[in-house]
Amino acid sequence: MDKSLTRRTFLSYALQQGPVLAVGASFMQLSTLSHAKGFTVAGPLKAADANGIRLPKGFKSRIVAISGKKVSNSQYEWHQSPDGGACFAQGDGWVYVSNSEEYFPDGGVGAIAFDGQGNIKDAYSILDNTVGNCAGGATPWHTWLSCEEVNCGAVYETDPFGKKAAIKRPALGYFKHEAVAVDSVGGQLYLTEDEKDGCLYRFTPSKPLPDLTAGVLEVAVVDAHQRVSWQAITEPNPWNTALSTRTRYQVKQATQFRGGEGIWYQKGLIIFSTKRDDRIWVLDIAAQTIKVLYDAKQHHPAILSGVDNVTVSPSGDILVAEDGGNMQLVLLDANGSPTPLLQVTGQADSELTGPAFSPDGQRLYFSSQRGQDAEQRLGITYEISRL
């Protein structure tokens, strides 16, 4: 995108509304992300198109799936309440996976397969009979980790291509999971928890990735200087034993994050959102320090609010989906400055979910979780591309 990140130092706010701090050089990795051809954005949003989406000049939208209706060229009825998603390369095409934030037995994950020209060639389920699958995370070994957002929620490792059965991963803990990001260099996973007093978790596997069968689950402890340390959870699966203490209460010093949402790994940084205070955070893995990149309270009016799913654009901007707010997908540059990428109109009781770019960076997928009928939860999944 033309709004690519620069090397200007950006300002962020301390953990508890402290003084403004200059971010060190290690955080400037945000400004060195690779550029992709084709998906560049410039200019204000135009009037809504036929699908009710306001886009910048030069872009178009199409509907690829609607809840309760069969996806083109398949027998799969698209699930209700589409939520977190990701794209995976497949031959000269790709697969877009999407969680279903429905309750048992309707939760799970669906997938749409596209050919190299973006035509839909199939759709199918890759996980079913689960509960409240909210977001998740793609792995470098091409699986999708789907997170249950319930008190005893688990993480399931799924195959986007529909060839292998899903596997439950208890070692990642039982709690109100939201999303997960994989640090492929350090060999660790980072997980968010959607509770008003939730934690940021880190999982270190006992064996090298991609083995997730066993390991150590820890919570972040942040000091007054925004330095991060980690303390182990004594029992990551409290709902399976006589121990009733939930994971977020097992370490007294654990730092509370107010409603953890989307999370993303990018070149040594962990980027995540917290919805109850409308913040975007950046954790520097090497330095083990954490900063606030965006705080809605510092913007009047707040262009970005209701922060939720997070991804990174081909040009390196952080892309944040709004749960409510103005029903926008919003870009953040290295200064934390927000710019709307698109806006969905006529669906004020919904939320935007699952933003993901195709492997070539030419197309963007996302959903309006409840569409125009919030009661029936008839979600709509869209594709954005150039004219």
Where are these regions (language model features)?
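Sequence/structural signature of beta-propeller domains
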Residues: 3, 10-387
